[in-house]
Amino acid sequence: MARVTVEDCLDQVENRFELVILSSKRARQLSNGAEPTLDWDKDKPTVMALRELAENTINKEVVMSDPDTPPFFG
């Protein structure tokens, strides 16, 4: 289990605020049974979401394409 840093994730998203929104929405999806794109390794959903963002296996379009996910801003 590798440590995930904010800097690793910021290479894939525009800013810290977008990172918080996307990672929290993805963590919620994982908690509700969404299929992870990486090996789980006993991580919590929040860590898994950050790992997926850092590894660029998911992006904004993937997270927001879930019909149960509310609009990004407003």
From Swiss-Prot:
Function: Promotes RNA polymerase assembly. Latches the N- and C-terminal regions of the beta' subunit thereby facilitating its interaction with the beta and alpha subunits.
Catalytic activity: RNA(n) + a ribonucleoside 5'-triphosphate = RNA(n+1) + diphosphate
Any one cellular-component term (Gene Ontology): DNA-directed RNA polymerase complex
NCBIfam families (UniProt xref): rpoZ
A family per Pfam: RNA_pol_Rpb6
EC number(s) given by UniProt: 2.7.7.6
Keywords (A to Z) from UniProt: DNA-directed RNA polymerase, Nucleotidyltransferase, Transcription, Transferase
Record-level GO BP terms: DNA-templated transcription
Keyword Nucleotidyltransferase: yes
Top-level enzyme category: transferase
GO molecular function: DNA binding; DNA-directed RNA polymerase activity
UniProt keyword Transcription, yes or no: yes
Record-given protein name: DNA-directed RNA polymerase subunit omega
PANTHER family in the cross-refs: DNA-DIRECTED RNA POLYMERASE SUBUNIT OMEGA
